Amino acid sequence: MEAFVGTGVALITPFKEDLSIDTEALSNLVKYQIENGIEYLVVLGTTAESATLTQDEKELIKKVVKEANAGELPLVLGVGGNNTAGVVEELQIADLDGFDAILSVSPYYNKPTQEGIYRHFEAISKASPLPIILYNVPGRTSSNVLPETINRIARNLKNVIGVKEAAGDIVQAMKMISLVPDDFKVISGDDMITLPMTLAGGKGVISVIGQGLPKEFSNMVRAGLEGKVSEAYQLHYKIAPSIEFIFAEGNPAGIKTLLAKKGIISNTLRLPLVEATETLQSKINSFVDNF
């Protein structure tokens, strides 16, 4: 399959009870993805609790993932921020060996205009030695990258090869798909609307639930890409309750509960994030038991 088509997963960061990085669990998580049909891995994205990691910890995570992956799957590294010059500098000094692309979130908090967003990605596209996937997640950034801006970026910044579209708006996603060149990838960043986006011409997903249910979720996406609509929706409706559960109290509290139930990680987060409530954990555990 073409690179960055199908199911990518935004890896969590497993922690031990003392909140240090659980490298063994991370290695096992990577291997679990490889063995169950995932097409690529995203390292140090939002789901990884990157905001709580030191630079040394980030380098350790990169090392562990690369060693566990052993060249099996393409790797995407999260590099982004709301200081354009800072992102440019990070791209210039970062060890990108072993990575195939960059995932870069649209600037958050300072709420740039569409022109500011365009110029931000223009600057980092010039600095990046790797292809860039833009990440639009207005629920976290407070600014939405509009379809027209995505199209402008797609046509003018050749190093930007796709967008992880996580506005949760299927109409906006379809407009993006209709505007951009055929070789520009519109990738779902919302697990619940991954299938309709894929059937509308999207290229798959960068998923959270996918790392917990890798075989079933990646099979759903492949079925959608192959036009097997009935088969894809059958899987979607089987998986859908888990998607509601894992985001009910924020990410990655829910997916960590699910992965802990499967025995892959310890259910530990760093403040300001906290574990899911006992009520939600019970729902997730019951889902896993009956899946």
Swiss-Prot record:
Residues annotated as binding pyruvate are 47, 206
Tell me what reaction this enzyme catalyses. Answer: L-aspartate 4-semialdehyde + pyruvate = (2S,4S)-4-hydroxy-2,3,4,5-tetrahydrodipicolinate + H2O + H(+)
Its chief place of residence is cytoplasm
Record-level GO cellular component terms? cytosol
Which sites are catalytic? 135 (proton donor/acceptor), 164 (schiff-base intermediate with substrate)
Q: Which InterPro entries does this UniProt record tie to the protein? A: Aldolase_TIM (IPR013785), DapA (IPR005263), DapA-like (IPR002220), Schiff_base-form_aldolases_AS (IPR020625)
This entry's Enzyme Commission designation comes to 4.3.3.7
Swiss-Prot/TrEMBL site (Part of a proton relay during catalysis) positions: 46, 109
Could you tell me the Gene Ontology terms of the biological process aspect for this record? Answer: diaminopimelate biosynthetic process; lysine biosynthetic process via diaminopimelate
Q: Name one GO molecular function term.
A: 4-hydroxy-tetrahydrodipicolinate synthase activity
Could you list this entry's UniProt keywords, alphabetically sorted: Amino-acid biosynthesis, Cytoplasm, Diaminopimelate biosynthesis, Lyase, Lysine biosynthesis, Schiff base
Catalytic class of the enzyme = lyase
Q: In which pathway does it act?
A: Amino-acid biosynthesis; L-lysine biosynthesis via DAP pathway; (S)-tetrahydrodipicolinate from L-aspartate: step 3/4
Q: Which domain of life is it from?
A: Bacteria
Q: Where in the cell is it found?
A: Cytoplasm
Function field:
Catalyzes the condensation of (S)-aspartate-beta-semialdehyde [(S)-ASA] and pyruvate to 4-hydroxy-tetrahydrodipicolinate (HTPA).
Q: Which family does it belong to?
A: Belongs to the DapA family.
Q: How does it assemble?
A: Homotetramer; dimer of dimers.
Q: What is this protein called?
A: 4-hydroxy-tetrahydrodipicolinate synthase
Q: Which gene encodes it?
A: dapA
